[in-house]
Regions:
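Signature of alpha-helical transmembrane segments and their immediate interfacial
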Residues: 1-38, 432-434, 500-548, 588-589, ...
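Transmembrane alpha-helices and their membrane-interface boundaries in multi-pass membrane transporters
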Residues: 399-413, 434-454, 461-501, 618, ...
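Hydrophobic transmembrane alpha-helices and their membrane-interface caps
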Residues: 30-35, 347-414, 472, 865-954, ...
Length: 1021
């Protein structure tokens, strides 16, 4: 390499400038570290949009055919569409648009624009009376701060006034995003009529409505231009309260009636209730607060806490303000834990360096660590990468790898100093002999993480910073090793270094003995290694599989699913029973309850649920992880024993993309009745498996319908239409909006309906008296018949086919992926017996895992190509490239040996770690093979070149392996990183041993190198 540019030599000749660069790098790193955003988990894009449409009065079938199907059909034109899922109830359509998991996050805003445009194109084809469609393309917004407001002795309206006041005041907090209220109940003024009394008086309820609307109308009365002035004319008559309504005199049928004489007027809350919210069992109103995108959650959280403290101090006695969820607090604790683990890893790596290299050499390596970290922090700040679970874990993993280059440089300098060279000569030679093999090894290691970086799935987006941080750390570590480490080494290392004892120590002799045995008995060594590899492949079936582990947060989610015809009042009663059970539990810190809806998205991977009167969700915060486990078991047993007929599910929070119940099977087909029949058959089969928890359907039960068949000819003779009858029945049963009362910032609906005694029974309709246009009262049954029918209250569809999803939890410690594998023969057999057009598809954890792993598999060829290219650039030999690569799969032996005894599952993150192992293992192998080449060029015989190169590289290879594996100990105890850490520690240790034993044996076998006889040994140069 004479005549080529030597970066280390340049650094030594420009030391002042290099020291300046180091100082600037450290200074920038410190400032970047302080400015980095903090998060608990990396963000990823929820690639889902919700389209909601209402068509009051329509049946479920009409809504499905005229609204839902039209929207679904149009959405099929989207190129990036994965599937459409819809939920149709009478008069209500909800369509979920799911984009392909590989859709780029930056393309999603444009795709949502296209969705708006496509639906706008078909608005003219929708039936009259449609409300919407409305679009929610912010489905993934996270409301990290949630407060509960309770009022002791206050009405819900009074409490809401205070919450609205706080809501308005916190708008001044910097970085505030969306703010939503939870559980507020709208006030309503009810006009409760007696249908019998109105009929006896000959009063048509529609006349009452028209009179009230006319008086309460807000209509311009004009403006007078009086010379230089403009005078607005105003009329009175608008209602300001229920008292104004009571005093109204109505002229009906040429007579005057006081409204209070023909209707009971009361002010209350919407009935049936809207979704309810409670805190620790007390009715409450929630205030959910989201931060603006890209903000610093800790800075925002601090500002929000200060403002909330100021505001709550001014609230009257009786108003309680409670923290339900505090993302800033969670992030501070999580990042604090991750940062502690990072510093633990730094200390471990430093200890390894000092023990193995000695004080001076270890100090050179120690100085390189903060330089690399500082430059990585600068990169993170300018690329928008925050400090969170994945990026900090990546730094910990990188720590053990980034010291490799510095160790190799220092080792080579010491070797040359032992030979009597000056420190400058030693540093220059270190670059000449190791810089490019190190760079090749670094690039190969980075290539091992490429499947993570180019994985376009949501899981890949979640773990992307793992690739970005490690790749930059590795590249920066090479620059530090060849630019900064030589300068530091020249100032720290001793000028005279005594040569190491030629005789190796006990460990060295053991390694040498093992290496020589392997080389002399090469086929035995190769055979044993291959046998171990085959055994490890076979043993992989005994390793448990998972997608992402459960979160290590203390929250527990408890879902209650009542029969789908249940009212919100029945759901509330079930919640009352459960809250009575948990209220005195010593393991619970607090809990919040959502009745008629799921929890607001306070945590990004939350599997958010739709509003449904038969559904409730409790978010219970336990006092710790041990308490969480015990509490889950107790709740599962209590719900199973005491809540028969109510579907329940108890789970900790998830990590990664949301899944919900882990075991899911979708039964789909053309005919709803047949789909229901097959779903019940499949559920019966699944129920025989003892590992499955409670099985529920997302829909299944038909509901009662009271059908009124109107004899149209008779109705027309009476001057009545179907619309007249339907409106009257709606006003009697559910209540119809009459007008509105303006009350401060609120609009209070005035609703006319039948009195309680009449409204609550079906007989009311059968005995209903209809007032005709001429004022006579006619029984409904005179021109109509009333009968009961069964109707599907709701229908879920997927890709325009009715689809029932069977969902279940896992009862024991078995992993969902393994259970699905166990159930596969049963599902396949059942699927084969279904009629044409009907099928069962597997969803849940297995489906989401497949979506995440599919893109990885597609990128692996690119990873292998990059590795092969880098190796060929360095080795210039196809044979040596295959020799080096042959060691890479052997890391699987260590992976299996680490996972099976510890019972650690193989998850998505562990798979990424195994792929990364390939690059790490090849890195050591390429440096060893390059060293063999150098010894051969120096005049050693092929046998001695292999022996000497292995002996020479043994120490640095073992040191880097120790640093890489021991450095991951702090994250091995983490729920998220544990599987990856165990897999990589086991893989690195075993692969390192095989690099020093198997690779020499394979090398001499491949090149047919024989051990020379003693009298034929060449002199060592």
């Amino acid at each position: 390499m004479k005549g080529s540019f030597n970066l280390s030599d340049w650094a030594l000749k420009h030391q002042s400038f290099v020291w300046y660069l180091m100082f600037v790098a450290l200074l920038m790193g410190v400032f970047s570290y302080m400015n980095l955003g903090r998060e608990e988990d990396p963000s990823f894009t929820i690639k889902t949009m919700v389209i909601q449409t209402r068509w009051p009065g329509a049946t479920q079938e009409e809504t499905l055919k005229q609204v839902t199907d039209r929207i679904e059909k149009k959405l099929e034109e989207l190129d990036s569409l994965d599937y459409v899922k819809s939920y149709t109830r009478p008069g209500e359509s909800t369509v979920f648009v799911f984009l392909k998991d590989t859709t780029s996050a930056k393309d999603i805003p444009h795709i949502w624009y296209l969705v708006h445009k496509k639906i706008d194109d078909i608005r003219g084809s929708f039936p009259q009376g449609l409300q919407g469609p409305s679009f929610n393309d912010e489905f993934g917004d996270v409301f990290g701060s949630v407060y509960a407001f309770t009022g002791d002795g206050l009405s819900m309206r009074q409490l809401r006034d205070y919450v609205e006041q706080v809501r308005a005041e916190i708008r001044s907090v910097p970085g505030l995003g969306k703010v939503e209220m939870i559980g507020q109940q709208d006030e309503v003024i009810y006009l409760n009529f007696s249908t019998r009394k109105l009929a006896a008086l000959g009063i048509d309820q529609r006349q009452v409505v028209q009179s009230l609307q006319s008086q309460n109308a807000v209509t311009p009365a004009g403006v007078i231009e009086a010379g230089p002035e403009r005078i607005s004319v105003r009329t009175s008559g608008q209602f300001a309260s229920e008292k104004d309504l009571a005093d109204v005199n109505l002229r009906l049928n040429d007579r005057f009636y006081r409204l209070a004489d023909i209707a009971e007027i009361s002010r209350g809350y919407v009935d049936p209730a809207r979704p309810l919210f409670r805190f620790n069992g007390t009715p409450a109103i929630g205030l959910a607060i989201a931060m603006q995108k890209g903000g610093n959650i800790q800075a925002f959280g601090k500002a929000l806490h200060e403002r909330m403290d100021e505001l709550t101090a001014d609230l009257p006695v009786g108003v309680g303000v409670h923290k339900v969820s505090d993302q800033a607090e969670v992030v501070e604790e999580a990042v604090g834990g991750f940062t502690s683990a990072l510093f633990e890893a730094v200390i471990i790596v430093l200890v390894v360096s000092f023990i193995s290299l000695g004080m001076r050499a270890g100090l050179v390596v120690a100085c390189s660590i903060p330089l690399v970290l500082a430059l990585v922090f600068v990169f993170m700040e300018y690329s928008g990468i925050t400090m969170q679970r994945v990026s900090l874990g990546a730094l910990i993993i990188a720590l053990g790898l980034l010291v490799d280059d510095a160790m190799i440089t220092v080792e080579m300098m010491i070797t040359r100093l032992e030979k009597g060279e000056t420190k400058e000569q030693a540093a220059t030679y270190a670059y000449t002999s190791t810089a490019f093999p190190m760079l090749t090894g670094t690039l190969v290691t980075v290539a091992g993480f490429v499947p993570i970086g180019l994985n376009a799935s949501s899981a890949g987006e979640y773990t992307f910073t793992l690739f970005a941080v490690i790749a930059v750390a590795m590249l920066v570590s090479w620059v530090v090793a060849v630019l900064f480490a030589p300068v530091i080494g020249v100032h720290i290392l001793s000028a005279k270094v005594k040569p190491h004892d030629a005789e190796p120590g006990r460990i060295g002799r053991a390694f040498n003995g093992g290496m020589l045995w392997a080389m002399r008995n090469r086929w035995w060594a190769i055979g044993i290694t291959v046998a171990l590899f085959v055994a490890s492949v076979f043993s992989m079936q005994f390793v448990q599989n998972q997608f992402f582990p459960s979160s290590d947060r203390p929250e527990i989610l408890v879902d209650l699913n009542l029969p789908q015809n249940a009212s919100i009042n029945e759901t509330r009663k079930a919640v009352d029973r459960l809250e009575a059970i948990i209220k005195d539990d010593p393991d619970i810190a607090r809990w919040s309850t959502y009745i008629g809806q799921g929890a607001i998205r306070f945590y990004l991977p939350l599997d958010q649920q739709l509003e449904n009167p038969y559904y409730a969700q409790l978010v219970i915060v336990s006092k710790g992880l041990e308490e969480r486990s015990a509490l889950i078991q107790r709740l599962q047993k209590r719900l199973r024993d005491d809540f028969v007929g109510i579907g329940s599910y108890v789970q900790p929070l998830e990590m990664g993309p949301p899944v919900g119940r882990p075991i899911q099977y979708r039964v789909s087909g053309k005919d709803i009745d047949q789909v229901r029949k097959h779903a019940i058959e499949l559920a019966t089969l699944l129920d025989q498996n003892t590992h499955l928890g409670e099985i529920i359907y997302d829909w299944n039960e038909p509901g009662k319908v009271l059908r009124v068949d109107i004899a149209q000819d008779k109705a027309r003779q009476l001057g009545l239409s179907s619309e007249d009858v339907a409106q009257l029945m709606n006003s009697v049963v559910s209540g119809a909006s009459v007008t509105q009362v303006h009350d401060d910032i609120y609009l209070i609906n005035v609703v006319g309906r039948a009195e309680d005694a009449e409204r609550g029974t079906p007989e009311t309709l059968q005995n209903l008296q209809i007032v005709t246009p001429n004022g006579t009262s006619i029984p409904l049954l005179a021109f109509a018949t009333v009968r009961y029918e069964l109707e599907q209250p709701l229908v879920w569809r997927r890709d325009r086919k009715p689809t029932i999803t069977i969902k279940a939890s896992v009862r024991d410690e078995m992993q969902p992926t393994d259970l699905v594998k166990q159930l596969a023969p049963t599902i396949d057999k059942f699927n084969a017996g279904l009629p044409v057009g009907y099928k069962v598809a597997t969803g849940g954890t297995v489906e989401e895992s497949g979506k995440a792993q599919g893109p990885i598999a597609s990128v692996v060829p690119l990873m292998l190509f990059l590795m092969a290219t880098f190796l060929m650039i360095q080795l210039h030999s196809v044979q040596k490239m295959f020799l080096v690569a042959s060691v890479a799969p052997l890391g699987l032996i260590g992976v299996v040996l680490a996972l099976i005894p510890t019972g650690t599952p193989m998850g998505f993150v562990a798979i990424l770690g195994i792929l990364a192992l390939i690059g790490i293992i090849i890195r050591n192998s390429v440096i060893l093979v390059t060293q063999i080449d150098e010894y051969e060029v120096a005049g050693y015989s092929p046998w001695d070149a292999v022996v000497q190169a292995t002996e020479h590289r043994r120490r640095p290879i073992l040191l880097t392996a120790a640093a890489a594996s021991l450095g991951m100990i702090p994250i091995a105890r983490e729920v998220f990183w544990g599987p990856m850490a165990y897999a990589m520690i086991g893989g690195i240790i075993i692969a390192t041993l095989l690099t020093l034993l198997f690779l020499p044996a394979l090398y001499v076998a491949w090149y047919k190198i024989r051990e020379p006889k003693p009298d034929q040994q060449e002199k060592r140069g």
